[in-house]
């Protein structure tokens, strides 16, 4: 299960802010790389683990610990998949406008559902029309696994511990 929490902090000191900003920028570059390389036809049928394994095999260095870039990869791939599924809804509408033959409808819907739409010229044209190559506009987001994030209370205030760029070190953020 995926859970999104957005926390606000009014009294974060400059060095912690700069650390978080640097980490978000590095992770934003990874997100952009994912969208650039897999945000089109190249990403159809690929899972985040296949890409992760390929990058590990190639020895790609992102200058961030493994967990943050893997979570960013997973999140970006799920965003691309959601974008592709939204395009499929538009294609379904085009399919229903094009034909009324139940057999042909079923064939086209099945190809679309199984991501085999490249085998049919009409579906390929429609997907190219509605599933244009996406781009990333998010460079200020850090995806943190639930088991890597801790909260604690100090002097009556709630604090959040998140991983930093330094291995086995955390950034403690006061929540207001």
Model regions and ranges:
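Nucleic-acid substrate recognition interfaces
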Residues: 1-176
């Amino acid at each position: 299960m995926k859970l999104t929490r957005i926390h606000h902090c009014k009294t974060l000191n400059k060095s912690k802010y700069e650390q978080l900003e640097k980490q978000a920028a590095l992770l934003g570059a990874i997100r952009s790389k994912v969208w650039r390389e897999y945000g089109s036809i190249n990403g159809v049928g690929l899972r985040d683990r296949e890409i992760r394994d390929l990058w590990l095999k190639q020895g790609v260095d992102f200058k961030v610990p493994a967990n943050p870039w893997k979570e960013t990869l997973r999140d970006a791939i799920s965003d691309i998949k959601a974008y592709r599924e939204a395009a499929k809804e538009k294609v379904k509408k085009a399919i229903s406008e094009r034909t009324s033959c139940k057999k042909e409808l079923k064939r086209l819907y099945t190809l679309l559902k199984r991501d085999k739409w490249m085998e049919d010229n009409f579906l390929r044209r429609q997907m190219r029309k509605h599933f244009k190559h996406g781009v990333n506009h998010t460079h200020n987001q850090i995806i943190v696994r639930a088991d890597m994030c801790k909260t604690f209370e100090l002097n009556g205030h709630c604090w959040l511990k998140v991983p930093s760029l330094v291995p086995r070190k955390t950034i403690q953020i006061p929540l207001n």
